[in-house]
Amino acid sequence: MYVHVLFVWQFECRAIIMLDMTKTAAQDLAEFLGDDEFGTVLADPPWRFVNRTGKVAPEHKRLARYPTMELEDICALPVAEHLADRAHCYLWVPNALLPEGLAVLQAWGFEYKSNIIWHKIRKDGGSDGRGVGFYFRNVTEILLFGTRGKNVRTEAPGRRQVNMIQSRKREHSRKPDEQYRIIEGCSWGPYLELFGRGIREGWTVWGNQADADYKPDWKTYSYNSGLAAE
């Protein structure tokens, strides 16, 4: 099930919510976006891991955080059809799925250029070693950066921006809000967020958690080191 939430920011915030359990994600997104085009896309897809039953997996039977998508279905999302001639993409990908992330960038019409690393830290500033991983204990996630078109260098702030975010974790899989300040300073709009949680002024947000009243509801929420969205 996908929830359409379209927000128009003028003097107030208005939401249009439509539910349809029969459509594919690609069909749903195409109808939601209509004829709109965007200069910057931010996406945090629900990646499917080989181990879908582990305790940290999104589809863990007891915790059941959220459904995931096959790589081919993520690639099939009609992102390229809704891009301006000059566009940027910021794509979150787990360390173990870097090749898949690069494949999605290409499928959406972008060329990989660089990345931003999110370093998850504790209260005292040290690495939050509660992450998982088969080979190493992961304390980072990757935000891939890709471009489309000509004359697509980042805006002036980007040339001073280091490619690292250091912040504490919040609920499972939620990404740091620091990303928005970086993206809005380095890239131009209109802005589109795919698989977003909650809403943000000045952005078009699509996803089944793109709701003004979004609150995490899984049990692991209370164990994470940071606070939820205010």
Predicted regions located by residue number:
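Class I S-adenosyl-L-methionine-dependent methyltransferase catalytic core
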Residues: 2-230
